[in-house]
Swiss-Prot record:
It comes from Shigella boydii serotype 4 (strain Sb227). The keyword Methyltransferase does not apply. Heterotetramer of two alpha chains (FadJ) and two beta chains (FadI). In the N-terminal section; belongs to the enoyl-CoA hydratase/isomerase family. This is Fatty acid oxidation complex subunit alpha. Catalyzes the formation of a hydroxyacyl-CoA by addition of water on enoyl-CoA. Also exhibits 3-hydroxyacyl-CoA epimerase and 3-hydroxyacyl-CoA dehydrogenase activities.
């Protein structure tokens, strides 16, 4: 059966050809290898029609132009040569579009990313809409790749080399007005006249290339280029710690094109693309992409979710304010905050104001839109306005009696269908629901701080939570822009449970004479965004250590923190960044770079001896405990799958994405090797390193958690 065409050609009466992009049965337009023949057939027709004056590419999708290339194409490649051939095919197709003798214009609405932007760059001009959905970027680096269809060569010639490097090395996405300012697009217009403006542009001569700013012209020359690439290379190495080979290859390929010409540049681009596609880093990053896409499609349960029309929040603190913001401004739902103190409500409202006003200042949002979103948030010191709320999120202090009281008050003041979702990080949901009259409507909804930035939420049903309550809570989390994983109601849930032994071990090494900065640097070198000691300071030492006794009571000695260390720190009024002193001392509020290790921390915790561990030895001790605990969580069905375990660790605590998550990392090392490392560490440092039974069994049988493909579980 012949595949329906994703590209269709219609010639208007004014002899402008309209090529409509609409991938059949897909929400998003993505480029697939099999479309090449369709596009070539259209190009042949365009060349044969001598009456044509111009061409416009436009999408039929309501919210995307082309969201990128289909990543499965890369997964289907088994060798460097196959992946390189894929890139060369893309390059050739873009070259054929660019070589058309009449003006070719891309009319862009919605996401124009990756291969989509490379197609737009191959056109002679670009017009995009002023809609917030319209973004342009080359995010391939986030998959451990580089743009493989000419993007590394066309973009620097259009907008300059320094701006290009910033875009490609970070995967940064530009809004319409930013793209216009940089010269990436020729015009920004309302969606209603996009086609009309693109057609008018196609009737003119090819748009002449805009002269680059003086700074970009200097940086493109030999001296400026040498300085720029040295500086950017150094900065990139510091940021990636050498863990992401794609960044090094991007610099190499862009520089080759500028120094040796586009022919050499395209050749280098295709070769680098092929080699990067086969790296373990790219395979791991693509697995995270597939897993997160899969999680976002997971409804959480088989039951249909209940309608969600409005939400209530109990507690106007930092978490309550953040939850109100994502509920109103991301989910678009009316939200009412209850706090016993009017000041708490004011703080929560100010939180959303600050977030939105920042967007207005950066010109990412209109003032009218800010006001419209703020109008969705209201506050009260009692339960007025709560009767009809579909779901209440509780974000009060971590106190069981208080949370049980909140359940009783919600059941008394809200509708019979109202769901009660607790943002607890440590208390069992079953205990919170113990005295509820409708326990089936009580669930855990654990956000991470800062709420607006952290992508993960844990959804925690207790034994009596209904399937519909789970589905409805998952639905809300997705509307809030979060990636939800459903976890079992056991102490620490998943993320905090695997994080605690990792941080405990860092503190234990500190007491044996290792330096704060050495421990943190070792884990940053391993691939974490910050080290464990700094993480504790950022979260708040009082908040971050609260769960340790809960975990120790539930699981025993392996969760015990070094004796009296935590109490010594807290008794010295050290809470971390929030009060200016923890393991580090902090400068004025807002000056993030001004932090230094406080030498007084060592005598305070009774540190003894001189640190003798290398960076790999430090990271090995912390990470192995995390891996072991993650495997226990699978074994005890705390997480439903290793997919959820990998996503939870990467999105919840910043486990190095290029390793693919704890379970991908175990597979890459081999379960047997992990067992051998842990047995060695157990001999050296004690029984907390004893590998769990599941890991030992898998090592003996040579089993892995994932199949060889990026998307399937063993």
């Amino acid at each position: 059966m012949e595949m329906a065409s994703a590209f269709t050609l219609n010639v208007r009466l004014d002899n402008i050809a309209i090529i409509t992009i609409d991938v059949p049965d897909e929400k998003m337009n993505t480029l697939k290898a099999e479309f090449a023949s369709q596009v070539r057939a259209i190009i042949k027709q365009l060349r044969e029609n001598k009456e044509l004056r111009g061409v416009v590419f436009i999408s039929a999708k309501p919210d995307n132009f082309i969201a990128g290339a289909d990543i499965n194409m890369i997964g289907n490649c088994k060798t460097v040569q196959e992946a390189e051939a894929l890139a060369r095919q893309g390059q050739q197709l873009m070259a054929e579009i660019h070589a058309l003798p009449i003006p070719v214009i891309a009319a862009i609405h919605g996401a124009c990313l990756g291969g989509g932007l490379e197609l737009a760059l191959a056109c002679h001009g670009r017009v995009c809409t002023d809609d917030p959905k319209t973004v342009l970027g080359l995010p391939e680096v986030q998959l451990g790749l580089l743009p493989g269809s000419g993007g590394t060569q066309r973009l620097p010639r259009l907008i300059g080399v320094s701006t290009t490097l910033e875009m490609i090395l970070t995967g940064k996405q530009l809004r319409a007005k930013q793209a216009l300012k940089l010269g990436l697009v020729d015009d920004v217009v309302p969606h209603s006249i996009l086609l009309e403006v693109a057609v008018e542009l196609a009737k003119k001569d090819r748009p002449s290339s805009r002269p680059l700013p003086v700074r970009e012209r200097i940086l493109a020359g030999p001296l400026g280029r040498a300085l720029l690439f040295k500086m950017v290379g150094k900065k990139t190495e510091h940021k990636t710690q050498g863990n992401y080979p794609a960044t090094e290859r991007i610099l190499e390929v862009v520089e080759t094109g500028l120094a040796q010409g586009t022919s050499s540049g395209y050749d280098a681009e295709a070769r680098a693309f092929g080699e990067l596609a086969m790296t373990p880093q790219s395979q791991a990053l693509r697995s995270i992409f597939f897993a997160s896409t899969d999680v976002k499609k997971d409804p959480g349960s088989d039951a249909p979710p209940a309608p969600l029309n409005s939400v209530g929040i109990l507690g106007g603190g930092l978490m309550g304010g953040g939850i109100a913001y994502v509920t109103a401004c991301k989910a678009g739902l009316p939200v009412r905050i209850k706090d016993i103190n009017p000041q708490g409500i004011n703080h929560a409202l100010k939180y959303s104001w600050d977030q939105l006003e920042g967007k207005v200042r950066r010109r990412h949002l209109k003032a009218s839109e800010r006001d419209k979103q703020l109008a969705l948030i209201s506050g009260t010191t009692d339960y007025r306005g709560f009767a009809h709320r579909d779901l209440i999120i509780e974000a009060v202090f971590e106190n069981l009696e208080l949370k049980q009281q909140m359940v009783a008050e919600v059941e008394q003041n809200c509708a019979a269908h109202t769901i009660f979702a607790s943002n607890t990080s440590s208390l069992p949901i079953g205990d919170i629901a113990a005295h509820a009259t409708r326990p089936e409507q009580v669930i855990g909804l654990h956000f991470f701080s800062p709420v607006e930035k952290m992508p993960l939420v844990e959804i925690i049903p207790h034994a009596g939570t209904s399937a519909q309550t789970i589905a409805t809570t998952v639905k809300l989390a997705k509307k809030q822009g979060k990636t939800p994983i459903v976890v079992r109601d056991k102490a620490g849930f998943y993320v905090n449970r695997i994080l605690a032994p990792y941080i405990n071990e860092a503190i234990r090494m500190l007491t044996k004479g290792e330096r704060v900065e050495h421990i943190d640097a070792a884990l940053v070198k391993f691939g974490f965004p910050v080290g464990p000691i700094q993480l504790l300071d950022e979260v708040g030492i009082d908040t971050g250590t609260k769960i340790i006794p809960v975990l120790e009571a539930a699981y025993g000695e392996r969760f015990s923190a070094p004796a009296n260390v935590v109490s010594s720190i807290l008794n010295d009024d050290r809470k971390g960044r929030k009060n200016g002193r923890g393991f580090y001392l902090y400068g004025q509020k807002g000056r993030k770079s001004k932090k230094q290790v406080d030498p007084a921390i060592y005598p305070l915790i009774g540190a003894q001896g001189q640190g003798r561990l290398s960076a790999p030895q430090v990271s090995e001790r912390c990470v192995m405990l995390m891996l072991n605990e993650a495997v226990r969580c699978v074994d005890e069905q705390v997480i439903r799958s290793v997919r959820d375990g990998d996503i939870g660790a990467v999105f919840g605590i910043g486990f190095p994405p290029f390793l693919g998550g704890p379970f991908r990392y175990i597979d890459s090392l081999g379960a047997g090797e992990v067992v051998a490392i842990m047995q060695r560490l157990a001999t050296q440092y004690g029984s907390r390193f004893t590998p769990c039974e599941r890991l030992v069994e898998m090592g003996a049988r040579g089993e892995s958690f994932w199949k060889t493909t990026a998307t399937d579980l063993q």
